[in-house]
């Protein structure tokens, strides 16, 4: 029997509180998660160089919590916490990969330990699973370490996952944003056609390495005399912001913005 989770994240708690409304009032939910970005590296947080106009506008329209902390500052444990509402000491996913100290990478034992890590998610009801009980369709894009998107309870998604080749932490999901937003557009149109509320997990692989931003963005930061490595990172932060603007445009063009919570 899965443990019923207690949502401790302020965002998830806030979202679940909205579900006391009638079915007709269920909001769509968009969960935006940047990757390897310092909390200071946004215009609305006062960064002197990085431009994030789309998120700045969103921040002006939103409640902003400026003091957030994570006990396990790694990608996979943090995403597992967002999906389950439990900290790493509860869900058991405390690292990105099995330790090579105990099994050689690529060995059968290593793969067994990796499968064991993925299975830890089975202890809990995930946020997409809870939303599905309330009639939501859900879509995964971007980073996802826990196997196929279906393993997280998403009804739709991009990540094929373990044990398929290339399924370590996102495979096809890592293309979102960097190579366009078409999978999200198709999903939103599908949800609208089905007359279902939807949940979007937008875990875009930005501004994470590789720092290969469009030249038009990189040029802006190189002209400020910044070291090239810094200029590339700053440009990737702005690139992330651009994709968030594209995501919001998808909602606005379909008249969905007023019926959507963006976290």
Where in the sequence are the language-model features?
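Positively charged n-region of N-terminal signal peptides that target proteins for export
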Residues: 1-5
């Amino acid at each position: 029997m899965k443990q019923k989770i207690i949502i401790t994240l302020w965002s998830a708690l806030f979202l679940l509180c909205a579900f006391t409304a009638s079915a007709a009032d269920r909001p769509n939910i968009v969960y935006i998660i940047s990757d390897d970005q310092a909390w200071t590296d946004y215009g609305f947080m006062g960064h002197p160089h990085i431009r994030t106009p789309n998120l700045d506008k969103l921040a002006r329209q939103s409640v902003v919590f400026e003091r957030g902390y994570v006990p396990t500052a790694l990608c996979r444990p943090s995403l597992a916490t967002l999906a389950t509402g439990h900290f790493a000491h509860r869900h058991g996913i405390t690292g990105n990969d099995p330790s090579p100290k105990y099994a050689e990478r690529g060995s059968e034992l290593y793969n067994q330990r990796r499968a064991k890590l993925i299975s830890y998610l089975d202890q809990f009801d995930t946020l997409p699973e809870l939303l599905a009980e309330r009639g939501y369709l859900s879509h995964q894009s971007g980073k996802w370490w826990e196997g196929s998107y279906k393993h997280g309870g998403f009804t739709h998604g991009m990540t094929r996952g373990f044990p398929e080749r290339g399924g370590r932490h996102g495979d096809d999901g890592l293309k979102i944003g960097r190579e366009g937003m078409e999978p999200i557009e198709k999903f939103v149109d599908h949800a609208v056609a089905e007359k279902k509320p939807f949940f979007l997990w937008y875990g875009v692989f930005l501004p994470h390495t590789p720092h290969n931003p469009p030249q038009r963005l990189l040029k802006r930061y190189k002209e400020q005399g910044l070291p090239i490595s810094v200029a590339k990172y700053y440009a990737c932060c702005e690139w992330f912001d651009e994709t968030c603007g594209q995501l919001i445009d998808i909602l606005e063009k379909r008249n969905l913005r007023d019926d959507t919570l963006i976290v």
